[in-house]
Every structure is written in C-alpha cells, then in structure tokens.
C-alpha cells in the first residue's frame, strides 16, 4: 500500500511568482497539442485539406480560452454550484485546480465554432482535426489533479498493490483514480484515436469516435473515483461524471452512424 506524498502544489518560486504544478501540466498539455498538430498536418489526407502550420497557433489561442473558461464554468455549474455561488471570488482562482472536462469540451466546441466561422471552415472538419490531440492533454490535466491530491478514488481493498491512502481525506486505502483516468481516458484513448485518425475518414467520424471513446472510458473509470455527487434514477445510481458522459456516448454513436451512412445510389 502507498501513501500519497502530498507534494507542495508550488513547483517553483521566482521571487513573488509561484509556478504551480497544475499550471505546468496545462502548459505541457498545450505544448503537446502543438507538437502533435504539426505531425498531423503532414499526414497526406490532412495536407490535402489545406491545413497549415499557421492555423495551429491561431487555433490554439481560441482553444486555450475555451478550455479555461469552459472548464472552470463547468466545474462551477456541474459539480459544486452552491459553494462557488457562496464564494464567487473562488471562481477566478483557477490555479487552485478544479476544472471540468465536460465544461472544457463544450468551451472548446464553442471556441472552435467561432474560429471555423472566421476561417471559412466547416466546424466538423475542425473537430475531426483536433480530436486526436485532446486525450494526451487530458492525461496531463489528470496528473495535475493527482499532484494536487484532488479527485481521490473510492475505497479499495487493502491487498491491492497500488492502493493509496490520501492523508487529506482519511486513512483508508483508495484507488488512485486520477492515474486510472490519465492512463485509460488519456493515454489509451490517444493511442486508439490516433491510429483511427491516421487514415482518411468521413466527415464527423474522428470527432464521433472521440465522443464515443471518451464517454465510454470516463463512464468506466468513474466507478473507481469518489463521486462529487450521485444521481438516482429508476433504481440506478450513477455519478455526476457518468451522467455527463452518457450524452457524449449517444452523440458519438449518432455522429458515427451519420458519417458512415450509405450514400443513396
């Protein structure tokens, strides 16, 4: 059994400037996006679609705004609205952690829609382009959560070799759920989606596969994460994260069905 090391959330201090691990993870996420995007624009079917290196930097600006604003608003509205409405100044303290992926997902969709409209591109093509770069960024975010000792897992069997005590919660062995989500929702999903997107696919197929894979992976890994709150419906209990993942699964299936529908003869 392990004990969470509870590291200092501040990675480095330069005078009055405190550089936090959580911020560094987001910086790493944006850096990997640029790196993978530059690889992706060299793929023949992407190059034929007219994607250029200049598009990446411009798109990243919109994406960063979408992730930060959408992710924070999602955390506020989906998970703990009563706390944030009682302490409104806490909403702006992003460096403390607390970002919702589902909120960030909606924020990026809106930001990319605005960017696509300004560039004269179809927003579905934009989403197909960026989707394979998202999972690794998500993995870095979950590593930031782990360093901050956020999102503790559900109670685990003490015989589990990687069970972990989170001193900021209690003295019970728990699943290291942020690491599960970094590996499954992040790394594994990246590998599957990147391989899928290497070949030319119909419009909406890559974006639809992303929604289906992420929704399914998140629904599964939520079983190991201590829920923020649970929803009871028709004798079934699911977590808030699972509830928010169901629409993504449905959306992904619908997008894939539309993308691969047979053209009329």
Curated annotation (Swiss-Prot):
Coiled-coil segments: none
Pathway recorded for this protein: Protein modification; lipoprotein biosynthesis (diacylglyceryl transfer)
**GO BP annotations, alphabetical order:** lipoprotein biosynthetic process
Family annotation (Pfam families):
LGT
Q: Which UniProt keywords apply?
A: Cell inner membrane, Cell membrane, Membrane, Transferase, Transmembrane, Transmembrane helix
The compartments listed are: Cell inner membrane
Q: What is its EC number?
A: 2.5.1.145
Q: What is this protein called?
A: Phosphatidylglycerol--prolipoprotein diacylglyceryl transferase
Write down the membrane topology. Answer: Multi-pass membrane protein
Residue numbers binding a 1,2-diacyl-sn-glycero-3-phospho-(1'-sn-glycerol): 142
> Of which family is this protein a member?
Belongs to the Lgt family.
Q: Mainly localized where?
A: membrane
Q: Name one GO molecular function term.
A: phosphatidylglycerol-prolipoprotein diacylglyceryl transferase activity
GO CC, sorted alphabetically, is: plasma membrane
Which superkingdom is the protein from? Bacteria
Function, as annotated, reads: Catalyzes the transfer of the diacylglyceryl group from phosphatidylglycerol to the sulfhydryl group of the N-terminal cysteine of a prolipoprotein, the first step in the formation of mature lipoproteins.
Q: What class of enzyme is it?
A: transferase
